[in-house]
Amino acid sequence: MRVAIYPGSFDPITEGHLDIIKRASKVFDEVIVSVLVNPDKKGLFSIEERVKLIEKVTEDIDNVKAESFEGLLVDYMKEKDAKVIIKGLRVVSDFEYELQMAHMNKKLDSSIETVFMMTNAKYSYLSSSSIKQVVMFGGCIEGLVPNKIIKDIINKIGKVR
């Protein structure tokens, strides 16, 4: 069974993330969307909320599940018997950073491969940070995040403001 891990903060998940998930689900037997627990980074959504949002937007994709993890990605991958890391690339600067991470992960575990997937051009400008800013200033996020979670995001940002 070919298990792939799609790690990230997903704070919140965007249409760009979902596009990568859908495409990866056609290539791998199982895709685990893994929310990284980073104690140094305070997100808008809690880790549990992010996992629930991912579950909500991927509920119709049978071979996708969402989890959280803490620690080294390579250790988590061993636990899940996964050999592939999926990374979405929007721009060249994403590649430069992700290439360094891929080399580090390969150094830590030579059996791990990183698969880079180009983001659909229509999502190349999207980031979770930009979504939060648009909502904070009263803008519309339709088409930027999955429709199923628009209200969740607006409600959360409304409470934080």
Curated annotation (Swiss-Prot):
Site-annotated residues for Transition state stabilizer: 17
Record keywords: ATP-binding, Coenzyme A biosynthesis, Cytoplasm, Magnesium, Nucleotide-binding, Nucleotidyltransferase, Transferase
GO-annotated molecular function: ATP binding; pantetheine-phosphate adenylyltransferase activity
E.C. no: 2.7.7.3
Record CDD domains: PPAT
GO cellular component, one term: cytoplasm
Main location group: cytoplasm
Cofactor (UniProt): Mg(2+)
InterPro entries: Cyt_trans-like, PPAT, Rossmann-like_a/b/a_fold
GO biological process terms held by the UniProt record: coenzyme A biosynthetic process
Class of this enzyme: transferase
Pathway note: Cofactor biosynthesis; coenzyme A biosynthesis; CoA from (R)-pantothenate: step 4/5
Binding site for ATP: 9-10, 17, 88-90, 98, 123-129
Binding residue positions for substrate: 9, 41, 73, 87
Superkingdom as given in the UniProt entry: Bacteria
Catalytic activity: (R)-4'-phosphopantetheine + ATP + H(+) = 3'-dephospho-CoA + diphosphate
Family the UniProt entry places it in: Belongs to the bacterial CoaD family.
Quaternary structure and partners: Homohexamer.
HAMAP family: PPAT_bact
Protein's name according to its UniProt entry: Phosphopantetheine adenylyltransferase
Species this protein is from: Clostridium novyi (strain NT)
Gene symbol of the encoding locus: coaD
